[in-house]
């Protein structure tokens, strides 16, 4: 894990007894953070924003948690999972403080979104760490995914010129966007996440062959829904994102 290289201590906000630095100095180094509470892990990324320059990543951290395993089988987050997540986020908060992070965005996706005790969980996160976590829906996930790859798409003329299918496979869902000349015209979120499908397969009774048939039928039904909503056959190129996609590649 990397540590701050150019800090003697945590940054502080100006007080009545200290003068604020010039605007140019303030803009030259602005550490910000994003936190992602996913189905199988919680992740932190800290970057430094400099006016007119691309973000410089300072720190990345990830901790495995079982939010999806709990939410997708029992519908609620278990005590052990909540405690493990709190410990991870508490550690992330200390890392953020060491960089002097003031601005951040923390989001939770399908696992927390579907848990019946999500409000209790979010309250505990706020009390324990001081972090305010925002539960986002599928449309916001798609928007953030597109925003993240938009600049990269512009560097590939073939992807911008034609029709491209953008797919992000997460633990709880798969987010699909159909891009025409680099702009999204269709998008949707579907229950095809790796953790969700694995938990569903384990919960079904019967022989291995019977469970495989049920699994395939379930996937086929979801794919039919996707085809009704998104013109898959028109896509000339495909772009897959996410840890599971990288593993398959």
How would you label these PLM feature ranges?
Residues 1-37, 45-169, 177-249:
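Nucleotide/phosphate-binding catalytic cleft detector across ATP-hydrolyzing
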Residues 40:
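Primarily the dimerization/phosphotransfer
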